[in-house]
């Protein structure tokens, strides 16, 4: 994916500050021929997947041809994965870097509601998974057909905005339409493949990406069907770091704890519950065992603010993800040893659910990363302690009323000593990271299209090349991008080895 210097120079010269004038519009999509791909699954790597797709497009990342890329965002963000909503779409004409897709107009629908397991869930429903615990939603939404979004009153009826997206160190303008809240719901059963047409990429997802491999989710959710019934999965050999994010009042309290223990300077707790000292030198630490105490179903009942140094009887909010979330799977493994310690020796703990809430320990279950961040901000506004797990691709941009949360050290190791929020994970000092898995639907029931399979393969191969926050290649990937010293070798339950 790396561009030669001559290509970089040419790209910069051609770009200037002009907008993306050749954006692939809804009318051009409707005119066809158009290839459709639908990805679902993890919310954490949304931006990484988007940028990997963009790196395969004409006119981007040093590729030849005209830049006609554009994106449709459900919300008001700047690009997928950045306050964009749980459903987005993006499109472009593929370059020779995309192999068999070269020259094709491709629309990618990307849905991240519900988290990682929704890469597999539609296919489980279509394959007749019994679903005794109700974890399979049975339906999924995506942005409505892009070809329709240029009509009157639709989000792409007017002129597109633009976002400058950096690919391989060069900034490229990509056309953007916001507030594309026109969505369509597809339903999955043993007799219905999304809709009557049953088309991969439009009626049902072709596959997607998960924070952890299928077997982890299968055990966590008591799923009966094996992966071979659905398709195939490959280890991307790309690591993704996670961190514990807390509300400002809890951040200040943890600073007070560390100041009292002589770990932080005496001035580090001079801030307030609405404006703590957020300088790196004053970042406080949270012992992992305290997170375990509130995340564990069997101990959450005795938790209140005093666990973290606050007043007895005060409220603590555990802002966790829904069971199908890969981030929740990562949290379960790191703090509860579930499902990794479910063998004969036992030791795994059950995660606390919303139904386990008490008057002083309130557990909520969020369907996306954005929900966690919003709940942490709400807790700050209510002067309450709150904590949850968020992937390290996220960075708060606080205002007086929004995004008021921050990452803390875990067992005195910071997850974000560097701007890219991954240095300690890559070095091996910070071990809260796991490797992404790529799933492609197969078999005779709900297979991906050949074009989608090719795209998923291409994206999986380039994820490690992107210089993105919280994301890094492992040595097994053989990537030219930022690379860690250790690897889990595609097994989340295996300790990283160097």
Give the ranges of each region predicted by the language model.
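Bacterial N-terminal signal peptides that target proteins for export
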Residues: 1-9
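General helical structural elements
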Residues: 8-11, 203
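Classical Sec-dependent N-terminal signal peptides that target proteins to the secretory pathway
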Residues: 12-16
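N-terminal signal peptide c-region/cleavage motif recognized by signal peptidases
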Residues: 18-21
């Amino acid at each position: 994916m790396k561009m030669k210097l001559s290509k970089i120079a040419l790209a910069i010269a051609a770009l200037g500050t002009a907008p993306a004038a050749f954006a692939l519009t809804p009318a051009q999509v409707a005119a066809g021929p158009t290839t459709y791909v639908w990805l679902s699954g993890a919310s954490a790597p949304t931006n990484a997947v988007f940028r990997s797709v963009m790196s395969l497009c004409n006119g981007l990342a040093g590729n030849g041809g005209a830049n006609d890329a554009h994106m449709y965002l459900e919300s008001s963000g700047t690009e997928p994965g950045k306050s964009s909503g749980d459903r987005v779409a993006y499109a472009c004409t593929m370059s020779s870097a995309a192999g068999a897709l070269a020259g094709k107009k491709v629309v990618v629908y990307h849905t991240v509601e519900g988290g990682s397991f929704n890469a597999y869930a539609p296919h489980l429903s279509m394959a007749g998974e019994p679903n005794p615990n109700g974890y399979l939603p049975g339906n999924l939404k995506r942005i409505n057909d892009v070809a329709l979004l240029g009509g009157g009153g639709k989000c792409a009826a007017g002129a597109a905005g633009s976002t400058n997206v950096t690919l391989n160190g060069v900034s490229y303008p990509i056309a953007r339409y916001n507030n594309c809240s026109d969505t369509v719901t597809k339903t999955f059963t043993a007799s219905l493949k999304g809709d009557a047409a049953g088309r991969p990429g439009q009626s049902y997802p072709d596959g997607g990406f998960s924070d952890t491999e299928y077997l982890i989710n299968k055990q966590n959710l008591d799923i009966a069907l094996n992966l071979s019934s659905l398709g195939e999965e490959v280890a991307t050999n790309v690591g993704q770091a996670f961190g514990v994010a807390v509300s400002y009042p809890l951040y200040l309290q943890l600073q007070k704890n560390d100041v009292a223990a002589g770990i932080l300077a005496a001035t580090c707790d001079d801030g307030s519950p609405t404006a703590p000292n957020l300088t790196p030198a004053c970042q406080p630490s949270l012992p992992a065992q305290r997170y375990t105490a509130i995340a564990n179903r069997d101990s959450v009942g005795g938790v209140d603010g005093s666990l973290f140094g606050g007043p007895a009887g005060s409220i603590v909010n555990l802002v966790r993800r829904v069971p199908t979330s890969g981030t929740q799977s990562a949290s379960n493994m790191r703090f509860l040893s579930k499902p990794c310690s479910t063998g004969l020796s036992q030791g795994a703990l059950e995660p606390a659910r919303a139904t386990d809430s008490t008057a002083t320990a309130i557990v909520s279950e969020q369907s996306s990363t954005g929900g966690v961040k919003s709940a942490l901000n709400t807790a700050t506004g209510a002067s309450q302690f709150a904590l949850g797990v968020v992937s390290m691709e996220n960075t708060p941009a606080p205002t007086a009323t929004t995004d008021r949360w921050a990452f803390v050290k875990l067992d005195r190791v910071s997850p974000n000593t560097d701007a890219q929020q991954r240095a300690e994970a890559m070095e091996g000092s910070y071990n809260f990271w796991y490797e992404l898995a790529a799933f492609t639907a197969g078999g005779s029931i709900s297979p991906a299209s050949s074009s989608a399979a090719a795209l998923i393969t291409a994206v999986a191969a380039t994820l490690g090349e992107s210089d993105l926050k919280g994301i890094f290649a492992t040595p097994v990937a053989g990537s030219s991008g930022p690379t860690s010293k250790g690897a889990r070798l595609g097994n989340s339950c295996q300790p990283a080895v160097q």
